[in-house]
Structures are given as structure tokens and as C-alpha cells.
Regions:
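Surface-exposed, low-hydrophobicity beta-strand/loop segments enriched in small/polar/acidic residues
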Residues: 1-306
């Protein structure tokens, strides 16, 4: 774990709060809200649900140590610990107003660098994002994988993806990468994007051979052929709306040892908004689930901006 300037709290959400935190007591509409999760409005204004990253704006994070413990004659609203969800209809302290540091939930498959902006995502989690043309790009790391590889990152259904931008940190001559969705089109976002030079990669959108263009079918409806004697093919970019259960981001690279970098899924939706900034550097983590290795969520210390 990298160094960060605050002490991780023990069975609490707040790591640092110099001023009074805005606390609203709301009702858990379902038993899915854990302390530290980003929440949004439920059915009514006094209901909350875990933010889904798509449908509604986030307005706070679920607290823990601020919750009412109740009395011997009544049931406590507070879960047993910060890893346990609030019961349905429990009163949840929703923290907001910014200016404090808290433990939030990082989505599976992603890591952070201290200082990263964090945006609301599915299941009350957050993801690291970078400003990109057309929106914020969710950063996903890649290395050499010669067969389709599940990144562990699941796009929330209904999310708009307008682009995928590759950043090469370790280039290899003639290396390429495909990016798509598991169980869907493995090169639906990018098809043979070059990784031969370090830095950000510009798409090949115009070529004498249509198959040399690098935007995939999710981001191009159809190529346009010019009327020139030596015809050129142009791939006009569009956007993809995530759905039909095809949500898991995957990639495949050429057989290029030492290849490494990141790609950025440029996303947009009403519920996809900046909610904080990472206070620590974390690598993606895995765990064994039902005898299989899977990427899992982890806590991340963050300055809260909502």
C-alpha cells in the first residue's frame, strides 16, 4: 500500500473531517447499501439506493459511525460493521457537503494513483477517471494477453461509451490491441489499435482498406467510401449504449512481450459524476471465488467532493 497522509479508520467511514459534515438521515430502500458506498435518490425523496452510475445523480455517501444505535427496546439501524449492508428501511446517515476524507468502495478491475479523480459507478462504487475528449475516461490497465481477457470491469447497463483511447507506457514494434465486451464483440470498441509508440494513440479512421480502420463496430455504424479513383474508407464515430447483459470489458493484444499501458473508456450518463479524489495508490486486486480467480472491490481512501 502506498503512503497517504491520513490514518485509515478502524470500523469507521470518516478518516478526516476538519469541519461539520452535512448529514441527512434517509431510508434504505433495499438491503444493498454498505457504509462508504455512493448513494442516490430512491423512489421517494427520503429513500436512498446504491448509486448505479447511470440513472440519477449521486448526492452523498453512506456513513456508519454517525448512525443511530437505537435503544434496548428498539432495533439498531447500524449494521454490525462497515462491511455489512444496512437493512431494508433502516435509517442511513448520508454524508455530503465535501471537505472531508472517507473510505469509499473502488470498483473491481481498476486501481488508483494518488490524486486520481473518482467518479460514481455501479453498485455504489467509484472508478478512477481522466478528462478526455468527449467526457471522462475510466482508466483500465493492460499487458500482453494473446487471448481475450476479462478486465473485471463491468460497465453499468445504460452507460454511454463514446470512445476508447489507448495510452501506451511500454511500446513494442508492430504491437496491437483489441478492446470489446466479453460475450459480445471482442473487438467492438477497438480493432487492431497500434501500440508501437509510447503515449496516447490516435485512431486510424481513414484508409484505402476499410479493415485497416481501428474503431470497432460498437463505435461505427458503417464506413463511408469516397468516390476517388483510389477509394478511401472513412469510419464516422458514433457511440455505444451498454445493454443486453454485455457489460464486461475485455481486451486482446498481439503476442508482444513487455507490452503495457492503459485504455480509457470515455463514458457519460446522468449518474456518472465526479465524487472525490483518491488519497492513495492501489493496484487492482483479485480473490478466489468459487474456485475461480476474480477481480474484486476494495476500499480506497478519498477526499469527498459531494
Amino acid at each position: 500500500m502506498g503512503y497517504y497522509g491520513f490514518v485509515e479508520p478502524d470500523n469507521k467511514v470518516i478518516a478526516y473531517a476538519p469541519n461539520t459534515i452535512l448529514i441527512q438521515e434517509e431510508k434504505a430502500e433495499a438491503a444493498t447499501i454498505k457504509p462508504g458506498m455512493v448513494v442516490m435518490k430512491g423512489t421517494n425523496d427520503d429513500d436512498v439506493v446504491a448509486c448505479d452510475g447511470v440513472t440519477k445523480a449521486p448526492f452523498g455517501i453512506a456513513g456508519y459511525e454517525q448512525s443511530f444505535l437505537g435503544a434496548a427496546s428498539s432495533t439498531s439501524n447500524r449494521p454490525a460493521n462497515v462491511d455489512t449492508a444496512y437493512a431494508k428501511d433502516a435509517r442511513v446517515p448520508v454524508l455530503g457537503g465535501g471537505g472531508f476524507v472517507a473510505m469509499m468502495h473502488l470498483a473491481p478491475g481498476v486501481g488508483t494513483v494518488k490524486g486520481d479523480l473518482l467518479a460514481s459507478w455501479g453498485g455504489g462504487t467509484v472508478v478512477p477517471v481522466v478528462p478526455m475528449p468527449g467526457g471522462y475516461g475510466v482508466r483500465i490497465p493492460f499487458v500482453k494477453k494473446t487471448t481475450e481477457f476479462d478486465t473485471g470491469v463491468d460497465l453499468p447497463e445504460g452507460m454511454i461509451v463514446s470512445d476508447v483511447i489507448v495510452e501506451v507506457t511500454k511500446e513494442v514494434a508492430d504491437a496491437t490491441i483489441d478492446v470489446g465486451l466479453l460475450g459480445g464483440d471482442a473487438d467492438g470498441f477497438l480493432d487492431g489499435e497500434s501500440c508501437a509508440a509510447k503515449g496516447f494513440v490516435k485512431h486510424n479512421l481513414v484508409d484505402g482498406t476499410a479493415t485497416n480502420n481501428t474503431l470497432g463496430a460498437y463505435l461505427v455504424e458503417a464506413d463511408i467510401k469516397s468516390a476517388d479513383t483510389s477509394a478511401l474508407f472513412y469510419s464516422p464515430p458514433t457511440f455505444h449504449v451498454v445493454g443486453d447483459g454485455q457489460v464486461s470489458v475485455s481486451y486482446t493484444t498481439s503476442d508482444s512481450t513487455n507490452l503495457a499501458g492503459n485504455f480509457y473508456m470515455v463514458c457519460a450518463a446522468p449518474g456518472f459524476q465526479i465524487v472525490g479524489r483518491a488519497e492513495e495508490t492501489l493496484a487492482p486486486v483479485t480473490a478466489t471465488v468459487n474456485d475461480a480467480t476474480e477481480f474484486v472491490s476494495q476500499n480506497v481512501m478519498a477526499r469527498v467532493y459531494i
